[in-house]
Curated annotation (Swiss-Prot):
It comes from Bacillus pumilus (strain SAFR-032). InterPro entries: Ribosomal_bL33 (IPR001705), Ribosomal_bL33_CS (IPR018264), Ribosomal_bL33_sf (IPR038584), Ribosomal_zn-bd (IPR011332). It holds the Pfam family Ribosomal_L33. This is Large ribosomal subunit protein bL33B. PANTHER family: 50S RIBOSOMAL PROTEIN L33, CHLOROPLASTIC (PTHR43168), LARGE RIBOSOMAL SUBUNIT PROTEIN BL33C (PTHR43168:SF2).
Amino acid sequence: MRVNITLACTECGERNYITKKNKRNNPDRVEFKKYCSRDKKQTVHRETK
């Protein structure tokens, strides 16, 4: 079961990315290191509601 999720920057809080995840394989909130255009560097982006 794939669902759409939004990834938000942990430093500035801006929601930068929309992606999909499989809830069966990843039931917890996912974290990725992605580029934040507001901070102009790579930061940890966490799944939000």
